[in-house]
Amino acid sequence: MGPAMDEVTFKSDTVLSDVHLYTPNQRHLMVRLNGMGQPVFLSQFKLLWSRDSWTDSGAEDSGPTDVSTEEMPPAGSGSGHSHEDLSLQAGDDNTIQEGLSVPLDEDGDLDVVRRPRAASDPNPAEPARDKVHPTILAQEEDDLVGDQEYESCPHSIIKIEHTMATPLEDVGKQVWRGALLLADYILFRRDLFQGCTVLELGAGTGLASIVAATMAHTVYCTDVGTDLLAMCQRNVALNSHLTATGGGVVKVKELDWLKDNLCTDPKAPFSWSEEEIADLYDHTTVLLAAEVFYDDDLTNALFNTLSRLVHRLKNACTAIFSVEKRFNFTLRHLDVTCEAYDHFRASLDSLEKLADGRLRFMVEPVEASFPQLLVYERIRQLELWKIVVEPAA
């Protein structure tokens, strides 16, 4: 028998998600230390609901009002550009188009007006950078701003406990952009998730599962590691007001991609009952995975698990995977490559070509042009892939 997923050892420095990295001046509430002694933080992710989407979700009429176009980020835009920046750029374009005078340098090139350097900059020879001063709040301190926003509009706030920088084997304890992209897609494709049974593989903090449960009947939120699953269970409890609105139930369970069978030991935390296993195989129609394609061995294990599961399901199903194409310079190639992404794509190709006479797999990319209801940087390297699994003709 091979090793468990949480026993795989990676030799790497700590990594930090871009979701947490690009939140300058945000108040980070540290709530506790987890079982491994890692600080756990509480962050709030605001849903930019419109009146129509709020009504469709089944929430009460006391929900938020229409979201103005100033608050809603356009699909495909990053959170790093303010609307003031966009309006200034538009103004510059209009100035050029109208033929007004444009400042040029001695070579005839556009003379860009630079922002004045701060007097406190210790090294004026280096390029200027914005000062970032994140505030770490102790557990006993009150996050008044966040609490007031939550109390005024609780159905527009997702609360997630997470860690910050972790070793590579613990990256599931952070929130990643791929999970936010997947959550946006879930909110957009209500028809696919309404009243169904969903299985998320490698759920991490559980954000996508929580969003899915606002529409789905049952969501099996799975991963490995007691500490991670316990944090995921806490996040489900923190957002029970959201899932209760749609009547969905989130069940946090252990599912190890490196093992053939589900854990049914009643003494083990997050194990499966026989009834839950029967429900999983009898009713699941949607499978999810967000940002879990960073190690070739685990990617192989996930695709093996996917194949094993769908052959046991009674219904045709759709799998939605999110992935970020990350570029790294490697000494082996002496070039910039994205090996983890390339291996993921190769695995998709192999799956589509699989012919066992029982099932056929249809793979296609999902264009990320759907509305953005969560604030994050939707970069072009973020991708969604859909796998439709049907009985072979």
Curated annotation (Swiss-Prot):
GO terms for cellular component: nucleolus; nucleoplasm; protein-containing complex. Keywords: Methyltransferase, Nucleus, Phosphoprotein, S-adenosyl-L-methionine, Transferase. SUPFAM superfamilies: S-adenosyl-L-methionine-dependent methyltransferases. GO terms for molecular function: heat shock protein binding; protein-lysine N-methyltransferase activity. The keyword S-adenosyl-L-methionine applies. Its EC number is 2.1.1.-. It is found in: Nucleus. Protein N-lysine methyltransferase. Belongs to the methyltransferase superfamily. METTL22 family. This is Methyltransferase-like protein 22.
